[in-house]
Amino acid sequence: QYYNGLGYPTVSVATTGGGGQTACSLTAYDALGREESLYLPVPTGSTLDYVSPSSIISSAAGFYGDEYAYSRNHHDALDRVTSVELPGAEWRSADRRNCTSYSANTDNEVLHYEAHVGTNSLVKPKDTSFEYYPAGTLAKVTSTDADGKTAECFTDMLGNTILQRVRMTTGNLDTYFVYDEIGQLRFVLSPTYQKNGKKAISAYEYRYDYRGRVVKKILPGCEYIQYWYDKADKLICMQDGMMREQGLYRFTVYDCLGRVAIQGLCSDCDRK
């Protein structure tokens, strides 16, 4: 990896899988130090020596037979990427690109689920103080790929992902993430949950101890997985449904430096 005078990585040289050949790629920056262009890798011989950007640019056009052998980023005034022009003359001539827009949620757009510390219940939107998140309370990022397929991501003021939505012609595929009051992820509700409302077969559940460690994980349609930790918060024992039927545990023993020393199965673990 080679860097420019400002410490930005520009030229990357790596060994490929066959015959010790190397490939080189280039990252170009604009006047504000933002990533502007990323050139596709080109073969450069069998050494890891530095290759000038101008050589990479000319080699890329010749190797791929395309003057647009690179992707190009466009930014807004806040330095966020708003669109990416994809490599290839055919993509460029058709103005096919990946686009990203930034906004906020509107009324009746995102359902409001709740989970509370000390309970294992999922509180559905109709049972909360407000069924939908009020307008403007969530950040919304909309991504549209070159084929016109759209996905949306909603996050709260703490940066927690609340909803990932994939737009479909027949409806939306919504995955909700539910947190408790102290920011612990408690439930992940898959798109099928929005149809059947059955937590046991369509939701992921995580339970924590008083130190914020996951002690039980419940996956859709599976027996729960249980975890035990030592005083240093290292995982020492776990048991899934199949192990439970056989009376087994998977254990881990660490050395004095906290490195994994022994792992195995046992029928009687000291889970304290």
Predicted regions and their residues:
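Beta-strand elements of repeat-based all-beta scaffolds
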Residues: 1-272
